């Protein structure tokens, strides 16, 4: 496990723990306790957990794209799963407020959660409804 994967896994667990301890207390008045934390979670996970099927194909010779693909491939399934679990825990506790962002994220991450249906996607096994 490289340094980034190690850090992201620990950071993900810390985010989940902070959500669990937050309970019904709000971080900002008028928001669910996990919104602010999981907004950051969504952003971070979108940087490395999503691997579009066309971006990493051999036809793309851009060094930047290749670097991005290597960056994605270096991430561990554990850290991706923990990030996803954190998002799911927020969704269940903040259904109405988090409804739209959750499904936007879910759509953008289609190949992560449904890796068997699209080529070139990161193989991740998550229990998803």
From Swiss-Prot:
Top-level lineage group: Viruses
Signal keyword on record: no
Transmembrane segments: 3-23, 27-47, 85-105
Primary localization class, coarse: host cell
Record keywords: Host membrane, Membrane, Transmembrane, Transmembrane helix
GO CC entries: host cell membrane; membrane
Presence of the UniProt keyword Metal-binding in the record: no
Membrane topology value: Multi-pass membrane protein
Subcellular location: Host membrane
Protein name per the record: Putative transmembrane protein 10
Species this chain originates from: Sulfolobus islandicus filamentous virus (isolate Iceland/Hveragerdi)
